[in-house]
Design a protein with these regions (language model features):
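Juxtamembrane membrane-water interface segments that cap and precede transmembrane helices
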Residues: 1-23, 132-144
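Hydrophobic, aromatic-rich transmembrane alpha-helices
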Residues: 12-15, 21-48
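Membrane-interface junctions at the ends of membrane-embedded or membrane-associated helices
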Residues: 41-49, 88-107
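Hydrophobic, membrane-inserted alpha-helices
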Residues: 57-65
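Mobile, glycine-rich extracellular loop/lid and propeptide segments
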Residues: 62, 86, 112
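Membrane-interface catalytic loops of GT-C/OST-like multi-pass glycosylation enzymes that act
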Residues: 66-78, 126-127
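Hydrophobic/aromatic-rich transmembrane helices and adjacent perimembrane loops
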Residues: 72-92
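Transmembrane helical bundles and short interhelical boundary loops of multi-pass, membrane-embedded
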Residues: 94-144
């Protein structure tokens, strides 16, 4: 997520272009990091077996790639992604239990859907304005 792969750009004149970039949904990828940290703390403090299971599988699927010294691409992380999503579910469940209502579930799912819709033009090659594409460059390392 720090430097996505830029696959394609097509210029259609004026301020209109299309682009395809390999980038994940920030609500899943970045929240997955927070959820992973939550699992680490949770496993040390409470030793819940279901969270330990998720943590072990995240480490088993991620560590072999983390130790490689060459450039890594998003697809190297794909085997870990289902377990990161389970970690997010565990974190969202914990937050919802603390809040004693389902509003956080609704908020998080709405955020995931919203960010999918917002980033859809740059992951699909949909023709749109250059200004819109530029507005999606949240980090300076995002070149597309």
């Amino acid at each position: 997520m720090t430097k996505p792969v830029w696959y394609y750009v097509g210029y259609y004149g004026g301020n209109v272009k299309s682009t395809i970039v390999g980038i994940g949904n920030p609500a899943i990828w970045w929240c997955g990091i927070i959820a992973f940290i939550y699992l680490l703390i949770n496993c040390v403090c409470t030793r819940k077996k279901e969270n330990l299971f998720i943590l072990v599988f995240i480490l088993c699927t991620y560590l072999p790639y983390a130790l490689i010294g060459r450039v890594m691409f998003m697809y190297h992380f794909f085997p870990t992604l289902p377990f990161m999503m389970l970690a997010i579910v565990s974190l969202v469940k914990w937050i919802t239990e603390k809040m004693k209502n389902n509003s956080f579930y609704i908020f998080y799912i709405a955020l995931v859907i919203l960010l999918f819709i917002i980033f859809y033009p740059v992951v699909s090659g949909m023709v749109t304005t250059s200004d819109y594409i530029d507005s999606l460059k949240w980090l300076s390392s995002w070149i597309f």
